[in-house]
Amino acid sequence: NIVSYYLRDKDLAEDVLISDIVKAMPKVSCATLETVMNLAALNSVYQGHEHIQKEDITEALLQVEYKLQKTDKETDSSELQKIAVHEAAHAVVGEVLHPGSIGIVTVRGSQGVIGGMANGCATYAQNEEEFLDEVTKTLAGRAGVSLIYGVMDIQASADIEQADKLMDIWQCHFAGGGFVGIESGDNRMSEQRLSYNEAIKSAKLEELYRRAYKILHNNKEFLLAVQHGLLEHETLLNSDLAKIRESCI
């Protein structure tokens, strides 16, 4: 509602959807929204557009909300294809598990470094199922590269680290890991319990990785179509993902 009210007088092209902006800015504030739209207007003028187009807003979102600036640095073609599959995999698993949840996905890296990102709406896991869905989505990048190229994704270390942290939270809140095995003397977990927890966590991570792989295998056409879209356009918004998925049905 805030976004709709703020944009009511903006000269927007027909391809601009309010829902795209809302989903791409999960923590929207009036100040940030104003900065995004001011930059989008400048982009529009610079590009010679009659109205503010979706591409103008997308570029502004990348620069303002995600601090991703354009770079002249070229990425190796084969490496870019793997990056595109990695980010597409995050988006595909997110959309399959929770349709409409992915707001923006891009292969543009930060500070000229190869990479990309996929970001969803401002959602908070309400239960264990939703929490494990988030972990599954986090592991999807590595699974996607393995599925399509049959190699280990060396760019996935940050994802694995994030998934590991999420599983620590899962054990504490959902798996009872925070309630047993405490040594009374210094209020710390026993070595036996730590080893037990690590074994549970590793097994669960493996299970969720295989789950992500299976989802991608079953939606391979969608995955490859999103990869193609990223290679062609660099960045996709929620409506783009919806159109791609519809075309794959």
Residue ranges and their predicted role:
Residues 1-56, 140-146, 173-183:
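Conserved C-terminal "switch" segment of AAA+ ATPases
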Residues 3, 29, 40, 57, ...:
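Conserved RecA-like P-loop NTPase ATPase core
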Residues 78-85, 91-249:
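Soluble catalytic regions of large protease machineries
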